């Protein structure tokens, strides 16, 4: 989603 929390989660998973 566009939520900041989800965004950080996606970034962590991406890296």
Curated annotation (Swiss-Prot):
Keywords: Antibiotic, Antimicrobial, Fungicide, Mitogen
Disulfide bonds: none
Superkingdom of origin organism: Eukaryota
One GO-annotated biological process of the protein: positive regulation of mitotic nuclear division
Role played: Has antifungal activity against M.arachidicola with an IC(50) of 125 uM, but not against F.oxysporum. Inhibits human immunodeficiency virus-1 (HIV-1) reverse transcriptase with an IC(50) of 60 uM. Has mitogenic activity towards murine splenocytes. Lacks antiproliferative activity towards HepG2 hepatoma cells. Has antibacterial activity against the Gram-negative bacterium P.fluorescens.
Protein name per the record: Agrocybin
Originating organism: Agrocybe cylindracea (Toadstool)
Lineage: Eukaryota, Fungi, Dikarya, Basidiomycota, Agaricomycotina
């Amino acid at each position: 989603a566009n939520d900041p929390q989800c965004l950080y989660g996606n970034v962590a998973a991406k890296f």
